[in-house]
């Protein structure tokens, strides 16, 4: 007996890309009552009057017409500015390196958009993320990595709550990216050959330094080695991230070993950028971190200890860790020293294939001593 999905309404977040296009197509083919929604989160009109969002919405319209679903555009620019972009700027002001994608999923795609979809009578929202959800008999939802390891996006979805996941579908989670392209091409979708978007949505193809400089005044200062040698001037602490190699302008001229130079720390109060030679410079290595905004996708006790694996950045192999949780804070102790743990980035916890949740990195430590001098 086939399941009748026609009474289940799914509102799909459509970006004008191939992933969300195939998401809508698959749900339509499975018989769901599908509505496509294009989210306009940022005014990206350039000096020539060209707006990427306008072009993307045309692609959404073309695909929606092809597969026969209604579609609308909704403007979340204010919500995005207040909840994501202000956070992004505040983190850079504090000398950290934020991850706006994590916050965008938490606050916009699975909060503002989810609320909007529910007002349209949705039973679920769906997106083109590469992640999977499974449901226990009691209704508890588990979020699993996407089947395509190279595309898995659970790192960016790690702040989603059980309530958000209850209302979410990820139709691409079991597919490999080439299969998604193939489905789009077979169906003749207008977006089948469209390039994937990369980078932060509100920066796009713009020069990052120039973009950030429009909102935060750059404050040049001294570049120093950890042992106090003056290495010249930096252009502003916000432009550098822990472990960064390029853009320092100092080559391998001092130290004799000709190894490349890396950013190893920042002192916000003195406006000093610390640099050191060698990929595994001792100041880049740490044995634990402190995280805040720690959150799990399922109900957990207020205080507990967890043995699991973790990622400290996207596209990184898992590392074995011990997590000591107290409220929304955690100490994460590494089984092996880790390189370039970066304040502002997400730390995400896994149990095998399941993403358990995560938090935001506040500080890295080496044998109890703070590493980055922020």
From Swiss-Prot:
InterPro entries (UniProt xref): MnmA-like, MnmA-like_C, MnmA-like_central, MnmA-like_central_sf, Rossmann-like_a/b/a_fold
Pfam family, one: tRNA_Me_trans
Transmembrane segments: none
Gene3D superfamilies: Adenine nucleotide alpha hydrolases-like domains, HUPs, Translation factors
Protein's UniProt keywords contain Zinc-finger: no
Interaction with tRNA: region residues: 151-153, 313-314
Binding site for ATP: 13-20, 39, 128
Species assigned in the record: Streptococcus suis (strain 05ZYH33)
GO CC, alphabetical: cytoplasm
Name of the protein in question: tRNA-specific 2-thiouridylase MnmA
Positions of disulphide bridges: 104-201
Record's function text: Catalyzes the 2-thiolation of uridine at the wobble position (U34) of tRNA, leading to the formation of s(2)U34.
Single GO term (MF): tRNA-uridine 2-sulfurtransferase activity
């Amino acid at each position: 007996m086939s399941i009748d999905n026609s009474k289940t309404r799914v509102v799909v977040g459509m970006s004008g890309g191939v992933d969300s296009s195939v998401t809508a197509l698959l749900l339509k083919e499975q018989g769901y009552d599908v509505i496509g929604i294009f989210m306009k989160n940022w005014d990206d009109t350039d000096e020539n009057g060209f707006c990427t969002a306008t072009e993307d919405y045309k692609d959404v319209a073309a695909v929606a017409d092809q597969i026969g679903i209604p579609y609308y555009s909704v403007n979340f620019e204010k919500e995005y500015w207040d909840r994501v972009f202000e956070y992004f700027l505040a983190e850079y002001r504090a000398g950290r390196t934020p991850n706006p994608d994590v916050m965008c999923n938490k606050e916009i795609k699975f909060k503002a958009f989810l609320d909007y979809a529910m007002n349209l009578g949705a039973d679920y929202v769906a997106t083109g993320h590469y992640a999977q959800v499974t449901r226990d008999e009691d209704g508890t939802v588990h979020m699993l990595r996407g089947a395509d390891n190279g595309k898995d996006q659970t790192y960016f979805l790690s702040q989603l709550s059980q309530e958000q996941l209850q209302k979410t579908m990820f139709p691409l989670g079991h597919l490999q990216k080439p299969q998604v392209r193939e489905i789009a091409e077979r169906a003749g979708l207008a977006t089948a050959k469209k390039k994937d978007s990369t980078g932060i949505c509100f920066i796009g193809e713009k020069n990052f330094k120039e973009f950030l400089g429009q909102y935060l005044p750059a404050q040049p200062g001294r570049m120093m080695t950890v042992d106090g040698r003056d290495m010249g001037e930096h252009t502003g602490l916000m432009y550098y991230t822990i472990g960064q190699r390029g853009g320092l302008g100092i080559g391998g001229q001092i130290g004799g070993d000709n190894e490349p130079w890396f950013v190893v720390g920042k002192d916000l109060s003195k406006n000093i950028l610390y640099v050191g030679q060698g990929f595994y410079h001792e100041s880049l290595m740490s044995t634990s971190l402190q995280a805040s905004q720690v959150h799990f996708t399922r109900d957990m006790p207020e205080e507990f200890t967890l043995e699991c694996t973790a990622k400290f950045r996207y596209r990184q192999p898992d590392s074995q860790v011990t997590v000591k949780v107290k409220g929304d804070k955690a100490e994460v102790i590494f089984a092996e020293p880790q390189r370039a743990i970066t304040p502002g980035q997400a730390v995400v916890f896994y149990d095998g294939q399941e993403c358990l949740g995560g938090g935001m990195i506040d500080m890295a430590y080496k044998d109890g001593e703070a590493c980055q001098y922020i």
